[in-house]
């Protein structure tokens, strides 16, 4: 303890910021110096799942801790609460933190005793200091008519509830400097028909698992650099109006992809796709002139035709990775049909730029061998070809390796790697 006490106050406060609030307060018993030091901690976390007594004692502890806090600014407040926590207490705790120029707020209401979600205090929607807001589970986004969050740059909404489909656009309209938005929906009852324009947004992640729900999104994000969309909603409709600055995109969509949607991705340098070409209505004429890295999932029907199209339309492609995500999705990679439609001529990227080819979950079936053989025979600049088979059988893996090693390669310097 003597060594720790020799550390500076700033360093000790930084250490205290990493431990739960209950333990922070307990340090006041160590010495006179610690009696006042814990009151200056600016990053506060309260989690009732660690509390062993009744809820009343937990509530009193939080009130006492907040009222004793003398930090000039509360940088971070994290509330992880269960069904016993009254909404009035949560609102008062958040309101107090806002008066101390709160910078970051994270609220996770794990479950609700009466299936009612917690509504945020109206003062939160007009905070001029809040920079990060993360809301999780039983939180209701009941947005007032006036929203002004000039400092908010990061907004995460994970499986929260919405008062109506105007809630999200209204909130975004009041965030003129928002840079990162994460939205995740799971089986929410409310159908969303959302149009939002966020000129400042640079990162957008949307995960929608509303199976059978008919949601519609129209997105205008001219400054976007990063896009991640995972969508299992069968009848979902999405439209992206403007993404000229996009650099990286990850798209995993069940249905509803349009030609216009793919055209909005043509500026990317890194692209991950899990979709069927039949969903895109044959995207001829779309050139991915900046694309360098392409990841393609093999768990959707027609992935081989999408591969053909992407090879033809990505003249600068340097890295190609085929991924069987069976372990993640529970789906098995679909075998390439015998005699799949080859490119009409050897794609430019195979002749002049492709340097790395990788196949994760390679099964060695006849159709799969055709795809692998085509790439190996035509990729003149290939440096590495790496195959990670799904099988753990040594004999089967050896047979796959022997087949691949017998393929004549266009590149004299390529290395065949086999995990």
Swiss-Prot record:
Pfam families: F-box, FBD, LRR_At5g56370. Residues 1-53 form the F-box domain. Keywords: Leucine-rich repeat, Repeat. SMART domains: FBD (SM00579), FBOX (SM00256). Residues 339-389 form the FBD domain. InterPro entries: F-box-like_dom_sf, F-box_AtFBL13-like, F-box_dom, FBD, FBL13/AtMIF1-like, LRR_dom_sf, LRR_FXL15/At3g58940/PEG3-like. LRR repeats lie at residues 55-81, 132-159, 160-185, 187-208, 226-253, 254-284, 299-324. PANTHER family: EMB|CAB62440.1-RELATED (PTHR31900:SF34), F-BOX/RNI SUPERFAMILY PROTEIN-RELATED (PTHR31900). This is F-box/FBD/LRR-repeat protein At4g26340. It comes from Arabidopsis thaliana (Mouse-ear cress). The lineage of its organism: Eukaryota, Viridiplantae, Streptophyta, Embryophyta, Tracheophyta.
